[in-house]
Structures are given as C-alpha cells and as structure tokens.
C-alpha cells in the first residue's frame, strides 16, 4: 500500500508572520508535526506542488493539481491533497469534472487551525483523509472532522468553526472512527478508463441578486464574461418590476449561458415553482438544480472549455457528471 500526499499550502501549512498566518510548511513538515509515520499503515510519500493561501488559488492551479493527481494514478493506491479551506470546495468540484473515472481514492483535506498551533484540527483531519485513502473507494472526496464527503457536494459553511464543511443536498459518504471506515452512502463509481480533461474557461462570473441591483451593472458584467451564474432568491426567479433585470438576462441568454443557483444552502432551484421562475426559464436561464454554488461555477467553466453552443452547454449543466446534481 503506497499513498501520496500532495501539498498545496493553506492554513494547515501556515506559520505565523508579522502579517498574520502564511502558508510556509511542506507536506513533509505537516506529516511530521501531525505525528504520522511514513510507514503508518502504508508507505507515505510527499510532494509539494503549490504553497499558497487558498484565497490565491486560480483555475490554472486546479489544472496543475489535477495533472499531478492524474500522473500519480499508476504509482499510488491513494492520494491526499492538503489544501486551504477557503477555496477547497471549488478545487474539489473542479477536480471532479476534470478527472473522470479516478481509479483510486483522491481525498482533499485541510484545517481551520494551523498545524503549528495547540489543539489544531490538522492531525485529526489528515489522519481521516489518510485512512480513507487507504481503505476507501475510488473517487474525489473531502475529509473534515471525521466525515468523508463527495467532492462536488461540499460547501464551507463556517468561517472559523472546526466543523466548517457540510455535504449539501447529499448524504455524507462515510465516517472515519480510528482506523475504521464506516460507509454511509456509496456513490456511483465509473468503470471506464481514467481521463484527464482539463479544458476550462475561467471567464465566468458569479453574481448574487440583491434588491436594488442595477440592470446596467448586470449588463456591463455580462458583456465582459463568457458565462454567468446568478445566485437568486429561494427556489429561483429574476426581478422584472422596477429595476428590470429579466430584460438584461433575456438579452444575455441569447448569446451566452446564464445559470441560476440559489442563495439558500439547501433545497436547490426549481424555476417551475413560481411565476418569476417560469419567466426566467422562458428567458433562457439554465437551472442549476440542487448543485452547490461551487459545483455550478466550476461546471460552467468546464462546459465552456468544451463548447460555446448554448444547447450543448445546457445539456452538460443538466447532466450528472460527478454526482453533483440529483435526478439527472
């Protein structure tokens, strides 16, 4: 049994500086500080590919991480990626679309407290990730606070608390208790050949609808992007009274994809439920269903990386690719 830990930085790798915490430690440092032996149930090797606060992560970095993961499949039985928590859910979603049919467990983890701090959650999360990488099943997952969650269903829900991640609109995959993996929900596992498909178009914007949002602001943003994710209210809909955003959306949706998600954490979008939602559908808006905001954004980037045909993009967004959407 041979595992690889890929270091990318984040709080888990941070040390104090005059400007606050900054990513500074290697993956090897993290293992040593966590008290994890290289032969602790498996031979563990480390490799550092980035060392960044995850606020600084860009789509190009997802490709770098994805390539490192894909190229390691033949040599390792499981992979753990240490990552900052702020954009971890974006990275786990992006990797899930770029890497098809992973043959081994790929587990992202991080911590809310640096591993150099007393009572850090880093050792606990790292051990959880390594245990699942050793005993779990193929796919891309997030390990946090003893939970294993599907990579496309995770959102960060707390900015400071240790239990910072939840699986949204989808059950937890498993729990890790000591050296034991307690499976709760086994996802669909592809049996095709592994494929690395990293084509992304990062020129996508996410806009949260708020009362008073100017149509001219929305129009200006729409002109500068290749696709838009609109975060609407509740089950979804677009204002058309007073400041008429629906008119702008209708114009935009004739030329580029406009996808609607919701500001509500749970439940997803149903544009058939209310009149404001049906008007959005008639305007050409693509519903995100019960996808997370992170999965919606990264999936749209991935779709645009493959085609500009609006009907094809709609089909991609509505199709379940990596467990990100229910009922497709």
Swiss-Prot record:
Please name the Pfam families in this protein's record: Asparaginase (PF00710), Asparaginase_C (PF17763)
Q: Which domain of life is it from?
A: Archaea
User: What SUPFAM superfamilies does the record point to?
Assistant: Glutaminase/Asparaginase (SSF53774)
Catalytic residues in the record: 11, 85-86, 156, 274
Signal sequence region: none
* EC class: hydrolase
Catalysed reaction(s)? L-asparagine + H2O = L-aspartate + NH4(+)
Q: How is its activity regulated?
A: Chohan et al. found that divalent metal ions and EDTA do not have any significant effect on enzyme activity, indicating that activity is independent of metal ions. In another study, Hong et al. showed that activity is enhanced by Mg(2+), significantly inhibited by Co(2+) and Ni(2+), and moderately inhibited by Ca(2+), Cu(2+) and EDTA. Unfolding studies suggest that urea cannot induce complete unfolding and inactivation of the enzyme even at a concentration 8 M. However, in the presence of 4 M guanidine hydrochloride, the enzyme structure is unfolded with complete loss of enzyme activity.
Identify the EC number(s).
3.5.1.1
* Binding sites annotated in the UniProt record for L-aspartate: 11, 53-54, 85-86
Summarize how pH affects activity.
Answer: Is active at a wide pH range. Optimum pH is 9.5. Optimum pH is 8.0.
Give the recorded use of this protein: L-asparaginases are widely used in fried and baked food industries to prevent formation of acrylamide, a neurotoxin formed by the reaction of asparagine with reducing sugars. TK1656 is highly active over a wide range of temperatures and pH, reflecting its potential in the food processing industry. In addition, its high thermal stability may facilitate its handling, storage and transportation.
Q: Which GO terms describe its molecular function?
A: asparaginase activity
Report keywords, A-Z: Hydrolase
UniProt keyword Cell inner membrane present = no
According to the entry, every stretch annotated as the Asparaginase/glutaminase domain falls at 1-320
- Assembly state and interactors? Homodimer.
In terms of PANTHER family, this protein maps to:
60 KDA LYSOPHOSPHOLIPASE, L-ASPARAGINASE
Q: Briefly state the protein's biological role.
A: Catalyzes the hydrolysis of L-asparagine into L-aspartate and ammonia. Also displays D-asparaginase activity, which is about 50% of the L-asparaginase activity. Does not exhibit glutaminase activity.
UniProt name for this protein: L-asparaginase
């Amino acid at each position: 049994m041979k595992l690889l830990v890929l270091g990318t930085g984040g709080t888990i790798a941070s040390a104090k500086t005059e400007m606050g915490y900054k990513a500074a430690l290697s993956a090897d440092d993290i293992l040593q500080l966590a008290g994890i032996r290289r032969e602790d149930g498996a031979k563990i090797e480390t490799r550092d590919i980035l060392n960044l606060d995850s606020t600084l992560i860009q789509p190009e970095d997802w490709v770098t991480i994805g390539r490192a993961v894909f190229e390691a499949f033949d040599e390792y039985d499981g992979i753990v990626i240490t990552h900052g928590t702020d954009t971890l859910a974006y990275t786990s979603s992006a990797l899930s679309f770029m890497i098809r049919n992973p043959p081994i467990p790929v587990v992202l983890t991080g911590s809310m407290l640096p591993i150099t701090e007393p009572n850090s959650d880093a050792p606990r999360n790292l051990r959880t990730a390594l245990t699942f990488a050793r005993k779990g099943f193929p796919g891309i997952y997030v390990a946090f606070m003893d939970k294993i969650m599907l990579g496309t269903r995770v959102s960060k829900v707390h900015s400071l608390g240790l239990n910072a991640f939840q699986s949204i609109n989808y059950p937890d995959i498993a729990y890790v208790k000591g050296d034991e993996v307690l499976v709760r929900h086994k996802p669909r596992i592809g049996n095709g050949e592994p494929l690395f498909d990293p084509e992304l178009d990062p020129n996508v914007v996410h806009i949260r609808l708020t009362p008073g949002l100017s149509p001219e602001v929305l129009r200006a943003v729409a002109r500068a992007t290749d696709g838009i994710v609109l975060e609407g209210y509740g089950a979804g809909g677009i204002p058309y009274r007073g400041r008429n955003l629906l008119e702008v959306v209708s114009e935009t949706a004739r030329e580029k994809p406009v996808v609607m998600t919701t500001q509500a954490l749970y439940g997803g979008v149903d544009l058939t439920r209310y009149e404001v939602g049906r008007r959005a559908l008639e305007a050409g808006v693509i519903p995100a269903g019960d996808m997370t905001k992170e999965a919606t954004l990264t999936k749209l980037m991935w779709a645009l990386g493959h085609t500009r045909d609006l009907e094809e993009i709609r089909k991609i967004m509505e199709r379940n690719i990596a467990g990100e959407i229910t009922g497709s």
